[in-house]
């Protein structure tokens, strides 16, 4: 399992409609289910998704950490303070939206010959 070997942000497939579907059909139901089970979640929730041609999300995996390397180009575009966002999240007071640089960002993983078998 080599995981991701590169990433770019923003992803053109993630339109406003796709974003809303992901939040309403995937993220919010998972967070609500954890809360309902008596385990409210505070932290990073990485959803590895596939988006089909109709814009419907399919979950591949969840992780309670940043995705790597997916997060690298996303953080290059973040204009809000990461420290402030984490502190606000821990206090349960996240702003509704972070501030983003509109320019695209790209991250590429460089691996030695033979990876991942070396």
Regions found by a protein language model. Give the residues of each.
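Short beta-strand-to-turn element immediately C-terminal to the catalytic PLP-Schiff-base lysine
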Residues: 8-10, 51-52, 76, 111
């Amino acid at each position: 399992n080599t995981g991701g070997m590169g990433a770019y942000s923003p992803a053109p497939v993630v339109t406003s409609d796709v974003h809303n579907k992901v939040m309403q059909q995937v993220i919010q139901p998972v967070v609500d289910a954890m809360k309902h089970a008596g385990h409210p979640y505070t932290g990073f929730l990485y959803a590895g998704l596939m988006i089909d041609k109709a814009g419907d999300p399919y979950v591949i995996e969840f992780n309670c950490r940043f995705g790597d390397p997916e997060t690298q180009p996303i953080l290059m575009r973040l204009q809000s303070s990461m420290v402030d966002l984490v502190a606000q999240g821990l206090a349960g007071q996240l702003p509704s939206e972070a501030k983003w640089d509109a320019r695209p960002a790209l991250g590429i993983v460089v691996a030695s010959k033979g990876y991942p078998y070396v």
